Amino acid sequence: MTKTKPAPHRVKMHVKKGDTIQVISGKDKGKVGEVLRTIPSHSQVVVKGVNIRTKHVKPRQEGESGQISSYEAPIHSSKVMLYSTKEKIASRICYTVTDDGRKVRMLKKTGEIID
């Protein structure tokens, strides 16, 4: 009987697609970019202009030359922090309820509402 691989522990993501974030650790520390895609099953995000990798693509047809393409690889969501474009500062978030009863994300340092 073969063993099945357990599903990775899923943690609620604090960022969503389209958010502006800043990288807080790693080789791309300090870079600001937009979240292109989230991968909740692995707690990872793909950020525009961050963690660029190169891939060598073999030629598909005869006579065609190979090429080198670059793409954004995913990084762990714990390495990013939401970024305020108005104040130019990264901040943690908290969840708060507005007067009309909506639950929204708010930056702790600036009080700016994200959603």
Swiss-Prot record:
Gene Ontology CC terms: ribonucleoprotein complex; ribosome
InterPro entries registered for this protein in UniProt: KOW, Rib_uL2_dom2, Ribosomal_uL24, Ribosomal_uL24_CS, Ribosomal_uL24_KOW, Translation_prot_SH3-like_sf
SUPFAM superfamilies in UniProt: Translation proteins SH3-like domain
Database matches in SMART domains: KOW
GO MF, one annotated term: structural constituent of ribosome
Superkingdom field: Bacteria
Family of this protein: Belongs to the universal ribosomal protein uL24 family.
Function: One of two assembly initiator proteins, it binds directly to the 5'-end of the 23S rRNA, where it nucleates assembly of the 50S subunit. One of the proteins that surrounds the polypeptide exit tunnel on the outside of the subunit.
Subunit and partners: Part of the 50S ribosomal subunit.
Protein name, as recorded: Large ribosomal subunit protein uL24
Gene: rplX
